[in-house]
């Protein structure tokens, strides 16, 4: 009876192999179910065919087909073919199975997710190649079906899933570093990055690998997953192979050094002087051999199991000792260099991990692996205690920007389910917060001084004092009202409609996002952009969001003439600071302060009498301006804002050009709306400036065969001519996001706003 069952299974296996290898292609999925009585390969996978007996397959298939349009999953028939290597295509084993995949999953991730669902590892899934076969057609690679990076499984297989076979070719390659660089793809790069990010953060990885930090984040988060060039994948594959080989070599050197130290101890034990020898007289080679032979041959209680039990010549022993010392020296130098590169992550401050050296090993392991769910509250408490800005804390704690820290605090994801990149950042913040309070304060002070020195050395010297119309009394008064303003917040009408009011106010007053964000909430344009993008429901439990919206509500509650006067005042201050002559950049700080005092006195003397609606003295003008942080807390942000004031909205700085060129190198010249949104918030530039830059680069590539060389100088997109702009991407981006405020559909309004800003700059 068992023999008959085996014969039946062998017959089914041969029929399945014939169907799979038939060039005409397999029949429809429903017909295949009716012929075999069970999904192909079920018997070989341990599933019995008896479970399907008595079930009308036509009826179940019909129900499955009718219910799939309402569900979120699609069945895909997969045939996995194992090969010994990529050159010899001798099929080793076949594995056929149905896999349920999500409809909203990206189509270019179908192979990887199918293999993961079948129980294969990430490394195996990364090395696989897939072909898709529809009906009796010839199988083709998935990349031939569509090149749209955002195409989903439902878009491609919704109507043909019952006649589709996904053929996956899996090559036997034990490790990613053994994979040839020519076979590296987007999937292998992403899995390799995920593996590397378990031991280091993105910034330290970007310093070593050929990918930039923004590109690493995009690949890991699948943002630009399909836009990585094949040449970049191969370059990363070559680097990864060299990196893993070097790392394995370091591990071997470490183990060899430990072994050599133990071996040296045992050799010294065997080289005890024989009677007649003195300590001053070194033993002769014959005596060394004579003295060491009995001790090595006789089993020692503490002899290392890896040591050989046969006699070793003195020359070989000396060579091994010299080699072990050399390896130890090289390893010590490498560790020293690695420690120096690690310190660069923390802006030349000692790494936070060093504080746990005196702790037991169990505590070190727990602090390195577990992140408390209270980390977000700890960060907020630290910001309040030290009176520092998010920009300063983000730089010294985990070497990131203020925007990323604000996004992390806004979402508050559970560390247990967080992504690997977020977990690295949370662990870095937690390690930093476990430093002594005095040491943290010293690091904050060093960072403030460093940012001040860098600002005075790099660009136009920022005005450290506030404009004369904003005395310190206004700040203290408004801060007091903010701290004691809980009843005021409760009486305010703060709901989801405040986002529409912000947009209407910017349209009415014709002010930019940067200007409104500064006067209403003392924030940057990127912060306001993210605020209006997500439009979270205001709630007092989300304290940070509630306080920021309360400041905006207080500002919007002011009379319209007062708001317009504040806009005008801030705009004049921006133009006044931006029109300073370039020769003042290298003037000593004492002369700059004297000039500032003279300018303030002149402005106070020449200032006309205030208009009738504002006869009150200046201390009562507190509600007009939003509360600010203390001057010490926001020194780094004020420096950044002052540097941004000096640059018109159409100018791209050298640093921003470097980021844009890195983006072009990694992604290309055709950014989507999300990429434009990200670059605009990251570089604090309007969208029309970003778009015109890419249009000009595409024009030069099309008509001149190469990208425009800016030679390390600032770029002003207002100087571009209309014929130098290739506008083949704007319409598609506008149609895709026609209903959002921050879509490229507003490019015309932004360009008009940008031209008015430029004209105002020229007039001033």
Curated annotation (Swiss-Prot):
Q: Where is this motif: Protein interaction?
A: 139-143
**DNA-binding residues per UniProt?**
361-448, 484-571, 646-705
Q: Where in the cell is it found?
A: Nucleus; Nucleus, PML body
Q: Where is this region: Disordered?
A: 1-56, 266-307, 450-474, 591-650
**In what ranges is there compositional bias, type Pro residues?**
607-629
Q: What happens when the gene is disrupted?
A: Mice are small in size, have disproportionately small thymi and spleens, and die at 3 weeks of age. Multiple defects in T-cell development are observed, including interrupted thymocytes differentiation and abnormal T-cell transcriptome. RNAi-mediated knockdown in neural stem/progenitor cells in the adult subventricular zone impairs early neuronal differentiation.
Record protein name field? DNA-binding protein SATB1
